[in-house]
Amino acid sequence: MELPAVNLKVILLGHWLLTTWGCIVFSGSYAWANFTILALGVWAVAQRDSIDAISMFLGGLLATIFLDIVHISIFYPRVSLTDTGRFGVGMAILSLLLKPLSCCFVYHMYRERGGELLVHTGFLGSSQDRSAYQTIDSAEAPADPFAVPEGRSQDARGY
């Protein structure tokens, strides 16, 4: 099943609205975490071909899923919640529920921009993929840099 094409600007606008409404109740660290990630999203919109921008935005969205769970669970007002407070809490929870879906769409955009999922089994250990590097004690002899191409004589150099 293929994901539908969703514009990154729509994702940003939706999370900006929900975060703004969530800040009615949860301010401080909730606002800093979410608006910082939205700034990374603006960077990803501005640089359409940047893999770094979209990967930072994706990583930030994943981090704010955890942070939002912590913020909502710690700072949830348990007494005398007004209608406005319930609305703000509801929007913060809706934002939290939509973030995994947004992560799927942003990951799809990351793959479209040429990003790859780099998972190494030897985390903090030596990697086994060294195909792009030549070892120092290689058995292959290097090509002779002073070899004369065929069809040209030794004295026909263009110095």
Swiss-Prot record:
Primary location: endoplasmic reticulum
Annotated localization: Endoplasmic reticulum membrane; Golgi apparatus membrane; Cytoplasmic vesicle membrane
Cytoplasmic side: 45-55, 108-159
GO biological process: regulation of blood pressure; response to hypoxia
Phosphoserine PTM positions: 126-127, 138, 153
Signal peptide segment: none
Stretches assigned to the Extracellular side: 1-23, 77-86
Subunit structure: Interacts with RACK1, and with the C-terminal region of AGTR1.
Protein name per the record: Type-1 angiotensin II receptor-associated protein
Annotated source species: Homo sapiens
Taxonomic path: Eukaryota, Metazoa, Chordata, Craniata, Vertebrata
